[in-house]
Amino acid sequence: MATFSLLPSGKWRAQVRKAGINRGATFATKREARDWATAIEAQANHIAAGGYAPVPKSVTVADLIDKYEQAASRPFGKTKAATMLMLKREIGKTKLANLNAVVLRDFVDRREAAGAGGVTIAADLSYLSAVLKWGRHARQLDLPERLALEVRASLVHRGLNTRSQERDREPTDQELDRIFAHWDGKARQKIPMETICRFALATGMRQGEITRLEVEDVDAAAKTVMIRDRKDPKNKYGNNQTVPLLPAAWAIVEPIIKEKGTGFLFPYEESSISASFTRACQALGIEDLRFHDLRHRAAAEFFRMGLGIPQVSLLTGHKTWSMLRRYTAIKPEDVHNAIKAA
């Protein structure tokens, strides 16, 4: 029930205790206090009846996103943080109670006109869906949690491709030789790019995983290293994984840990490594090659070495064969060679 108290300042204090809700607020007039208390009691009645609280008329999409961000246990990654800013910019002023398929249709129109592709727009809607789902289940608000997912599913009817194009590019031996020779001739090259690239080829690790490795994560006796917060579609944090360091990788790591004793194995900015790799490719006229393609080459080499799916998955961190398959690049002649070797 609601109680009202006249404060010495002349303002009115409303307090609502009902169905597990205990909230209070101060207002200039008793009428405002009563109106607020009535709305809060209505929410309590909805919750008590096993339903969800009605969305307050004044709450906007941006308000809900702000609450979602504040409730997060850790900071968002760069992509998610940028998407949340974009959502607040594009539809943030929309009243949450007015959010519907037409609003999202117009949002998609604007994104498409701005040059965003189907994959990007689908990701935008997936992030929005996560916010709506959180609002419904964490805040018990009567929100259409599947709204964004339904609009996402409709993108195909617009002719938008929502599946990212799978790359099958991997560097050739000749390309790698040219790139390494390019860095050898650079006296001002501060980042040991050849060493980092060879480590990527020997481990199949992502660029961010390489730059996060610390000496303390290495078990010299077991020749393993722990990758902290390894990428996982369900768990962004706490997904630590210990992986073996194969001979080529151990040959790189062993002198580093002996020399340093502590700290990062490769204390360089991820963006700087990527930029250096891109500049080298541009200078040499090597087209459509990215640092991440070294991971593709590594995964393919693991299979060519005769490792099975479980072993390669442990090295690369892929959870399923469907995720790993795009990196294999197994050729028909590889199958023939494997049979001959058997």
Show which residues each predicted segment covers.
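N-terminal core-binding DNA-recognition domain of tyrosine site-specific recombinases/integrases
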Residues: 23-28, 66-140, 165-168, 186-191, ...
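N-terminal helical hairpins
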Residues: 26-58, 62, 70, 74-77, ...
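Basic, Lys/Arg- and aromatic-enriched nucleic-acid-binding interface segment
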Residues: 118-126, 137, 141-207, 211, ...
